[in-house]
Every structure is written in C-alpha cells, then in structure tokens.
Amino acid sequence: MKKLFGTDGVRGVANIHPMTTETAMQLGRAAAYIFKSSSRRRHRIVIGKDTRLSGYMLESALVAGICSMGVDVLLVGPLPTPGIANITKSMRADAGVVISASHNPFQDNGIKFFSGDGFKLPDEIELKMEKLLDSKKIEALRPTATEVGKAFRIDDAAGRYIVFLKNSFPPELDLAGLKIVLDCGNGAAYKVAPAVFEELGAEVIPLGVKPNGTNINAGCGSLHPEVISEAVKQHRADIGIALDGDADRVIVCDEFGNEVNGDQIMAICATDMIARKQLKKKTLVATVMSNMGLDIALRKVGGKIIKTAVGDRYVVEEMRKGGYNLGGEQSGHLIFLDNNTTGDGVLAALQLLAVMRRREKPLSELAEVMIPLPQVLVNVRVRERQDIMTIPPVAVAIKGVEEKLGNEGRVLIRYSGTEPLLRIMLEGQDKYEITGWANEIADLVRQQIGEK
C-alpha cells in the first residue's frame, strides 16, 4: 500500500514532511537506483519545476540524491509538466521529475515522476520507490570518484517545447486575426504559452505572467475563470484561456465570457474528430466526474464514452490499454495521445482553436454541441477517511437521494487524492433541488467526520 504517493505523486506543504529536502533527496536516490539499468552508458534524469519559491530547495535536494547514485541530471528550469514529459522523451533520458503542486497554493509543493517514454509511473514502480527510501540496499551501491553524477542545465528547453507545441497545430491553419486573453496563473507556462499563440499569429492579452515565487495560482489561472471572463468582455476577445500552475490543465471561456470546461472542450474536439474520422474506435475516455451531458453529446454523433476513476493517470492508462487517442477530465486535464503523453493545457487549447478555425465558428456556437445537466459539487474538509457508506445516517441520506433521482441524475461521492476533502457531486434536472440534497449530505458528513 502506497503511503507517500497520492494520485499525482508526493505532495504536501513545503518543508513539512513529506515535502522536505530529506525526502526529496531520498526520492532522488531511489529513482536513480530504479532507472539505472545494467548497461554501461551514463544515465540521465530530467528535472523541471514550476515557479514556487520552494522549488529551488527541492530541486537541489533531488539533484544531490540522483547524482549520489551515479546518474546525471538535466535541469530544464520552470517548464510546464507536459513540457518536462516531452523533453524527457525527446532527450532519451531514463526518467523525468516534476517539482510542482499543480493548482495548489504556493506554500504546497509536490514531486512526480515520468518514465523515459514520457508517461507517469505505474503504481507498482511508485511502491517500489517508496520501499527503497529507507533501504540499506542503496547504501552499499554508492559510486565514488568519476562514477558520481553531475548536473547540466538545458538552456533551450523552453524553445524546444515551443517548437513542439507549434508543430501540433495543423500547418494549413494559423491564428491570425484572433484576439486571445491568456492567463498563465503566474505558473510554469508564463514564458512558453504567450510565445506559442503569438508566433501562430494571434493577438495575445497576457495575464498571470509575472511569477514571484508566491503568487502562483493566487486569484488567477484555471481555478479562477472569472478573471479571463471579465478580461474577454473588456477586450472584446474571441476566447479566454486559463492554465493552472503547471499548465497540465486548461479552462476556456467563449467570446461572451461564458466558461467552457473540460467536458465541453472534449465534446467539441471529439465530435470534430469523429467527423474527420480521427477519433480512434469513436471512443472518448473520461472520468466518473464528467457530466452526463457529455455521454449524450457523444451518442448523438455515433460515439461512445468510457469512464475511469478520477485522475488523469487513470485516463491515460485506459487510453493506452484500449488504443484510444482522446481523453480527459472535467477539470481541464485533456490528453491528445497522438501528440503528447500527458495532459497538456496549451496543446489542448491549440486543438480547440484548430476546430474554431476549421469550422469558422465562434466558440459559443461550438459549445452548443453539449448541454450539461445541472451539476453541484460540495467539498467537505474531513479529519479521517472513513468509508462513507459505513456511516448509517450518511448512507441512508445518499440512498434516499439516489431513489429520488432515478435515471434522471446521479450521486458521486469520493475522497480527494491530494487533500483531506470529501467531494460530494450530484447531477440532475433541477439545480435548486440537487443543491439542497448535496448540502444535506454535506452537513451529515461534517457532523460525523468533519474537520474539528
């Protein structure tokens, strides 16, 4: 059972266990040990980060751990998570490490790993890494003299990723004449994203491009779509694009400032790909959090949807297993597997813009392909993770709501993979009604296991 790794690597408040320099160094050593094959060549691991203040100390600790095991390090500096995955693959490195807590506030940080092919590590390798942290096995294998590793800085990493992103956009199209509001959330994409859209011909109004180490995701980025919504109306832009701290997710808004979430972007792109015979097996992979409106939209055009557990890694695993090429989450993690190995906010925005260009339609019109069912999400902070159906009053309330909804909606209750939260999600035809039911369940949960 993994204790350290959550659904997206190791995460926590920087400088408090487990997100300490000591743990980072041990993780570096364990990763180097695992990825070092028996061949005699030099081994290399890529390390990138977002713009958090604590990224510097964790980066240094990881470098020390990796080099102490005789593996070299390639430092790419602040770069989107998908960019680090891409460079890990293109530079033929043995693994990649991302120092980021994604959409969390600046005081948090995280460490996650990619294997040499650019995909996130499977659970069993994370478990192996965890077991090695306190193992004496590593101690006996420390190299000396010329065998220790060294660190190199890759100065053109951002430029390489910009070229990769531009090459993912159809060569017969451009963005000339489009006005784009772009909010980088003071995160990892602050240099890369504006350059990509500008070089493809768009007029870019950049927001959240002045990181100072403490302002990442602070009232900006994909968790605050109201920022791009207001700016789009103010500047009369064609689209607003908001990225999170490590730019692996994207939320957009149309020319009227209305939010278009991950489900709607998937509906637009999937229906376009079906029309062009590009969607493999006419199948989209989404998670259980996706709105039922997405299922309906896909069925209308002869497509189907497969649902996985929450977490983009599970979406990618299902896509690879079934040979599918489009998947994602409502939160804006969108995976175009023909182009990249993980969720990529900038790449997803480019694919959406390509549909707008190809169809010569505004985003508001394209978004009509999906009519979302009213959905309510209530988060409750909890002191313990108890199976919710073993708490009698909560279980009775949930079953009662499910009976009332019948086939016209659903109840989904799950714990967050990264925070002490229970997420209560209801879907149904009447928003007022389901909001009341969601709050009733939330109140019962607070009484039983809520944070004191």
Swiss-Prot record:
Known cofactor(s): Mg(2+)
Listed Gene3D superfamilies: Alpha-D-Glucose-1,6-Bisphosphate, subunit A, domain 3 (3.40.120.10), Alpha-D-phosphohexomutase, C-terminal domain (3.30.310.50)
Cofactor annotation remark: Binds 1 Mg(2+) ion per subunit.
Keyword Phosphoprotein tagged: yes
Intrachain S-S bonds: none
Residues found modified as Phosphoserine: 102
GO terms, molecular function: magnesium ion binding; phosphoglucosamine mutase activity; phosphomannomutase activity
EC number: 5.4.2.10
Superkingdom, taxonomy of origin: Bacteria
Binding residue positions for Mg(2+): 102, 244, 246, 248
Gene Ontology cellular component terms for the protein in this record: cytosol
PTM summary: Activated by phosphorylation.
GO annotation, biological process: carbohydrate metabolic process; peptidoglycan biosynthetic process; UDP-N-acetylglucosamine biosynthetic process
Catalytic activities: alpha-D-glucosamine 1-phosphate = D-glucosamine 6-phosphate
Alphabetic keyword roster: Isomerase, Magnesium, Metal-binding, Phosphoprotein
Active site: residue positions: 102
HAMAP family the record matches: GlmM_B
Family: Belongs to the phosphohexose mutase family.
Task of the protein: Catalyzes the conversion of glucosamine-6-phosphate to glucosamine-1-phosphate.
Protein name, as recorded: Phosphoglucosamine mutase
Species in which this protein is naturally found: Trichlorobacter lovleyi (strain ATCC BAA-1151 / DSM 17278 / SZ) (Geobacter lovleyi)
Gene transcribed to yield this protein: glmM
